[in-house]
UniProtKB/Swiss-Prot annotation:
Keywords: Cytoplasm, Initiation factor, Protein biosynthesis. Component of the eukaryotic translation initiation factor 3 (eIF-3) complex, which is involved in protein synthesis of a specialized repertoire of mRNAs and, together with other initiation factors, stimulates binding of mRNA and methionyl-tRNAi to the 40S ribosome. The eIF-3 complex specifically targets and initiates translation of a subset of mRNAs involved in cell proliferation. It comes from Aspergillus clavatus (strain ATCC 1007 / CBS 513.65 / DSM 816 / NCTC 3887 / NRRL 1 / QM 1276 / 107). SMART domains: eIF3_N, PINT. Belongs to the eIF-3 subunit E family. This is Eukaryotic translation initiation factor 3 subunit E. SUPFAM superfamilies: Winged helix' DNA-binding domain. It holds the Pfam family EIF3E_C. It is found in: Cytoplasm.
Length: 450
């Protein structure tokens, strides 16, 4: 299509712009990978690169994987990447040498930690351990000859296993270290390492436990370090994206965490692009039957407020959809942005599995908003805005009325829906405004602590 050609009717209905971009162009324009990488451990970046294999130039992806992992101890995998890049069946001697060094170091760590590892697998020993780490260490020292150096060897061994890509072993070793160590800095580091390991083994329940442990560590260990808290919260927000969209029970807990004053302030200050994921979570929560109406409406209002505040700092088709629908009340723009949002969702590692749910929920929200501000609705017109034919639109509206229990009736003869909108009481309006003022006050308290 020529650049100056007008859009076809089909283009308008699908929400494409007058100068339409392809799905690939939209995906590339809103690719967040460069923004996400600085906040992720290199091992956590790897799944994102793997996901991009089918979207970007394959040679560039392979080279990126090599650059990402060449400093790890995943020697065999890195050597295979080198062979693929150089189209060779042989590898340089340096890879062979490093492999031997890694195997030797693994053997050394295994021997150093063998005694304490065996003790921690002995039920009679574990039965004598208590919540007091110092007392536990004293007991193990007096009864079994365990030293602080042995405990620290668990930490070093766990880190080494992680660098080798043995994430399950790393998680277990770091857990054992954390049970005994009184070194707060190393314990905090081990908790981050265990979180990454649980993510990379897709152990989502365990990962969520570690998210909460890291959160508590940030609040206590960095209590007098606001800059450190900001940086660590930023990291935690990004790491938490893995369970956020892969583990349904995590959705509520993490949405609540992200909306808490400390974390929404972190998002607005340091990483506004996270609004994409927060918006996607809130929109898709519309489909979840167990969500209470009051809780969902609060999330939606908080999201609208933040999108309005941060529009100058960050926007993409997902946040633009929220803006068009709830701030500008522009239904044509909302439908256009929904089409673009679907392309972005399907190209985003974290959101690809939520794309269908997002589109379904977004259509419901368009319908609900449209019905709220119109007294008489033309079924054909609303169907067009939803990208549906008239029969599909009619069924959609019938289901909408049934599901939301709105006071409305359908005039099949005229092809319209007549809405009965009860007026909102002054008392209710005051409550809504008070809630908004309270939220802003809480955020300001974290921005400007007294």
């Amino acid at each position: 299509m020529a650049d100056n050609a007008p859009p076809t009717a089909e283009t308008l209905l699908s929400g494409a712009a007058a100068h339409p971009q392809t799905a690939e162009e939209i995906a590339n324009q809103y690719n967040l990978l460069p923004k996400l990488i600085p906040y992720l451990d290199r091992h956590l970046v790897f799944p994102l690169l793997e996901f991009s294999s089918g979207q970007d130039d394959e040679k560039e992806v392979v080279r990126a994987k090599y650059e990402l992992l060449k400093h790890t101890n995943m020697t065999d995998y890195v050597a295979n990447l080198w062979k693929e890049i150089h189209n060779s069946d042989t590898i340089p001697d340096e890879f062979v040498k490093k492999r031997e060094e890694v195997l030797s170091k693994l053997q050394e760590y295994e021997e150093e930690s063998a005694k304490i590892t065996q003790l921690l697998q002995d039920e009679s020993v574990v039965a004598n351990l208590r919540s007091d780490k110092a007392a536990n260490l004293k007991f193990l020292e007096e009864q079994h000859g365990v030293t602080v150096e042995m405990v620290n060897s668990l930490y070093e061994y766990g880190r080494f296993q992680y660098s080798c890509g043995s994430y399950g072993n790393a998680a277990e070793l770091l857990y054992q270290f954390r049970v005994l160590s009184t070194d707060n800095d190393k314990v905090a580091s081990a908790t981050w390492g265990k979180l990454a390991s649980e993510i990379l083994t897709t152990s989502w329940d365990a990962a969520m436990e570690e998210v909460l442990k890291v959160k508590d560590s940030i609040e206590t260990r960095l209590f007098n370090n606001p800059l450190g808290q900001l940086q660590n919260r930023s990291w935690l927000i990004h790491w938490a994206l893995f369970p956020f969209f892969n583990h349904d029970p995590a959705r509520d807990a993490l949405t609540e965490l992200f909306f808490s004053p400390a974390y929404i302030n972190t998002i607005q200050t340091n990483c506004p692009w996270i609004l994409r994921y927060l918006a996607a979570a809130v929109i898709t929560n519309r489909n979840r039957a167990h969500k209470s109406s009051g809780s969902y409406q609060k999330q939606l209002k908080d999201l609208i407020r933040v999108v309005r505040q941060e529009g100058y700092e960050y926007s993409d088709p997902i946040t633009d959809f929220v803006k068009a629908l709830y701030i500008d009340f522009d239904f044509e723009e909302a439908q256009k942005k929904l089409g673009e949002a679907e392309d972005v969702l399907r190209s985003d590692f974290f959101l690809v599995s939520a794309a269908d749910a997002f589109v379904e929920a977004a259509r419901h929200l368009i319908s609900e908003s449209y019905c709220k501000i119109h007294q008489r609705i033309d079924i054909k017109d609303l169907s067009t805005r939803l990208g549906l034919n008239q029969d599909e639109g009619e069924k959609w509206i019938v289901n909408l009325i049934r599901d939301t229990r709105v006071d409305a009736k359908i005039d099949y003869k005229e092809g319209t829906v007549i809405m009965n909108h009860p007026p909102q009481s002054v008392y209710q309006q005051v409550i809504e405004k008070t809630k908004g003022a309270f939220f802003r006050t809480q955020v300001l308290r974290f921005v400007f602590p007294i």
